[in-house]
């Protein structure tokens, strides 16, 4: 998930990153 489409980062930083 996330606007970047990067689930690896979304799980840490949230949907904003």
From Swiss-Prot:
Segment forming the signal sequence: none
Predominant subcellular localization, coarse grouping: secreted
Keywords for the protein's UniProt record, in alphabetical order: Amidation, Neuropeptide, Secreted
TM regions (residue ranges): none
GO terms assigned for molecular function: neuropeptide hormone activity
Family: Belongs to the pyrokinin family.
Protein name as annotated: Pyrokinin-5
């Amino acid at each position: 998930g996330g606007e970047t489409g990067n689930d690896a980062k979304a799980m840490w930083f949230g949907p904003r990153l």
